[in-house]
Amino acid sequence: MHKDEIQNLTALEAASELEWLAKEITRHDVLYNRNDQPEISDAEYDALRRRNAEIEALFPELIRPDSPSHKIGAPISEKFEKSVHSQPMLSLDNAFSSEDVSEFMERVRRFLRLPETQMLEITAEPKIDGLSLSLRYEQGRLVCAATRGDGYVGENVTANARTISDIPQVLQGKFPDIIEVRGEVYMRRADFQALNVNQQEKGKLAFANPRNAAAGSLRQLDSRITASRKLQFFAYACGEVSEIFAESQMGMMEKLKEYGFVINPLIKKIKSLEELISYYHDIEERRHALSYDIDGIVYKVNDLMLQMRLGFVSRSPRWAIAHKFPAEKAMTVLEGIDIQVGRTGALTPVARLAPITVGGVVITNASLHNEDYIKGIGSKGEPIREGNDIRVGDTVIVQRAGDVIPQIIDIVAEKRSKDASAFVFPYLCPACGSYAVREIGEAVRRCTGGLICPAQAIERIRHFVSRNAFDIEGLGKKQVEFFFQIQDETLCIHTPADIFTLQRRQEKSLVHLENMEGFGTVSVRKLYDAINARRKIPLSRFLFALGIRYVGEVNARRLARAYQNYTAFETAAMAATMPDDKVGKEGNEAWMELTNIEGIGPQVGEAIIDFYKEVHNREVLSGLLCEVTPLDEESVMTASSPIAGKIIVFTGTLTRMSRDEAKALAERLGAKTSGSLSKKTNLLVAGVGGGSKLTKAQELGVEVIDEEAWLQLIEG
C-alpha cells in the first residue's frame, strides 16, 4: 500500500492496521531472533516496519504501548539464563537508496548544527550477516557473553562463546578494567557447506544459510556442539567501558585489534557522501568474492563525542545507519511444482527449478507459498504479479534475500509457451489420497487423512524427537524414515511409544539393528542411551511434543504452568470436549478455564479438544504414558525431598538434561538455585567442564557431586 493510501485511512482503519502490524512484526521478530527461522525477506520485514512508522506519524494519538517502533529483537528463550545488558544493544535504522543515505547525513548535520563546510567523517564497514554478541571483560578476563535478545536482556551463552577462537579469553596490552565488546558471530560459506554435508550424512536437517547455522550453533545447550562448528567473530563496537580509551570509531577499532580481537579489514574512514556511495558499490561488486555473507554497509559517525551528542531514538542510534543491498535476483525455468505434506497436514507447493546461481548459491528449489500465490492472488485477495498465475514451464524470476528460502517473485509473461496450462492444486493428498480441504479464511489446504497419512505421521515423529520436544539424539530425518518404512515389527516406529519399546523388542529379535546399513554397535548403544535418558521429561516439553495444532513452545509452557501436571491437563481437556447441550461451551467450566488461560483462547482450545476427541490419539497417548513420565510443573511434595531448602549451583555441561531443566527440577523439589557460589551454597553439581567454580567450591568447603550422583540424589 502506498503512502497516499495511508493518508486515506480513517482513524478506525488505522487503529485496526496498527494492531495487526504490532502482532505481525512481533511474530517475525521471534521467528528471526529467537527461532532462527525467518519466513519473510529483510525487504518485506522492513516494509512492514516502514508502514507502521508512516501510520504512526499520521495518527500519533493511536501509537500503541506495544508498538514495534519501541522494540528491538524478540523476547529471549527460556533455554538460557538471562543476562541484562548494562547498555542496550540497539538495532540500526535502514537505508535502501543513495537518497536515504543523503537524508541520514543531513539529519546528522541538522542535529549537530554543522555547516556544510565542516567536514563530517564517517566510518564504513560491511554489515556481517550473523548473530550479534556482547562480550563483557572484567580485569581483562571474559566473564559474560550474551546475545542481543530484546535489546535489554539477552541469553547468557558464555560457555559457547569461549569455544570461538576469534574471541580472546584474556585481553592483551593495556585495557579498561571493565569493557563490553560487541560484534557479530558468523560462519564462513565453506564451513557452512561442510557442516551441511555432515548434517545430511547424520540424517539431520540442513541449515538454510550461514546466518542460521551460526545462530543455531551459538545457541546450543551443549557447548561441545558449538565447539565442533567453525564460528568466527568480528568486533565492531563497545558497550559499557570503565574509562575512555579512544576518541574515534576508527581509534576504537584499532585498540580492539590491539586487545586481541579480529576487526573487519574492509573498514574505512570516509569524508564525503560521494565516497560513501562509491564504497557501497565497490563492496557490493566484491561481496561474492568474500568468504562470508554480508547484506549491506554500516555507516557510523567517526567522532565518539559527536556520537554521544547525537544519542539515540527509541530503538536505534542517530549516529549510525545500515545501507542494505537489494535482494539478488536471477532468471530460470520452472521445471515442476512439488507438493509437500507437513505434520499438521498442510500442503505446501515447492518450485523445482533449472539450477541457477543467485548470490553465490546454486538454487534448485524455491518457495511458492500457497495455492493463491500460484494463482496470482495476495494474502488480502488483491492481484499480485499483475494477476499472472505461475505455470510449469514458465520463465520465472527468483529472488534470494537474506535468510529466507528463495522465492519466485514474478514470471516473464512474453516467454510463456502457448501450450502451458494452469496449475491445478491437488484436492487429494499426494501421500495418502485423502481429501485435502481448505477452511474458510485460511490460505492453506490440509490433508484430512490425519494419522493414516504416512507423510504426516513421519513429520509428527520428527517433531516429537526434535530439539525442543523430547530432543532424542540419533533420530534425525533419515533414521525416522527408516524406522517408519521398515516392515519388521521389532524395528518399526509408527508411534511415539514405539521409540521407547524399540530396545525391548530388539532384545527378542533375530534381526538386529546393529547389522543394518548405517548403524553399528556404538551408534545403537548411543541411541538407546539417548532414548532412555528421556523417559522423564518436563510437562511443557511433553505437551509441545504431542504436536497439537497451535500448541507451540510458548503455549505448552502456559498450559504446563496452568495445570501443573499431566493428569490435571488431560482431565480438563476431556471435560472440555463435552459441553452442556443446553448452555453450550460457555456453560462448560473446563472449557472456560482452558480458554481463559493467558494466550490460549478459543482457537487453541478447539485444537486441544479436536486432538483429545480423536480415539486413536488417546490410544497413542495411553501407550506413550506407559513408557514415559511427564514431570509435574511444580512439586507439591517438597517436604520429604532430600534437597528441600538447600541452595544449589550447577556448572559445566550436563549430559542427561539441560542445565535449565536441572535448575527447574531442583526448584520443584524445594531447592533454591543460584548462578554463583557463596558460603551459603550447600551443593555444587558439576558437569563436564566445570572450570573455576570447582576450585572455588573447594575453597569454600561446598560439597561437590557429579551428574550421576545428582540423579541418584533426586531419584532417591
From Swiss-Prot:
What positions does the entry give for NAD(+) binding? D42, A43, E44, Y45, D46, S91, L92, E125, R148, E184, K300, K324
Which cofactor names does the annotation list? Mg(2+); Mn(2+)
BRCT domain boundaries = 638-716
Q: Which GO terms describe its biological process?
A: DNA repair; DNA replication
Q: Into which EC class is this enzyme placed? A: ligase
Top-level taxonomic group: Bacteria
**What is the active site of this protein?**
K127 (n6-amp-lysine intermediate)
Q: Which Pfam families match?
A: BRCT, DNA_ligase_aden, DNA_ligase_OB, DNA_ligase_ZBD, HHH_2
Q: Which GO terms describe its cellular component?
A: cytosol
Keywords attached to this entry = DNA damage, DNA repair, DNA replication, Ligase, Magnesium, Manganese, Metal-binding, NAD, Zinc
Work out whether the entry's keyword set contains Cell membrane: no
EC number assigned by the record: 6.5.1.2
In its keyword annotation, does this UniProt entry include Hydrolase?
no
What reactions does this protein catalyze?
NAD(+) + (deoxyribonucleotide)n-3'-hydroxyl + 5'-phospho-(deoxyribonucleotide)m = (deoxyribonucleotide)n+m + AMP + beta-nicotinamide D-nucleotide
Example of a GO MF term: DNA ligase (NAD+) activity
UniProt-listed SMART domains: BRCT, LIGANc
Where is Zn(2+) annotated to bind?
C429, C432, C447, C453
User: What job does this protein perform?
Assistant: DNA ligase that catalyzes the formation of phosphodiester linkages between 5'-phosphoryl and 3'-hydroxyl groups in double-stranded DNA using NAD as a coenzyme and as the energy source for the reaction. It is essential for DNA replication and repair of damaged DNA.
HAMAP family per record? DNA_ligase_A (MF_01588)
The entry sums up its family as follows: Belongs to the NAD-dependent DNA ligase family. LigA subfamily.
Q: What is this protein called?
A: DNA ligase
Say which species the protein is native to.
Bartonella henselae (strain ATCC 49882 / DSM 28221 / CCUG 30454 / Houston 1)
Classification lineage: Bacteria, Pseudomonadati, Pseudomonadota, Alphaproteobacteria, Hyphomicrobiales
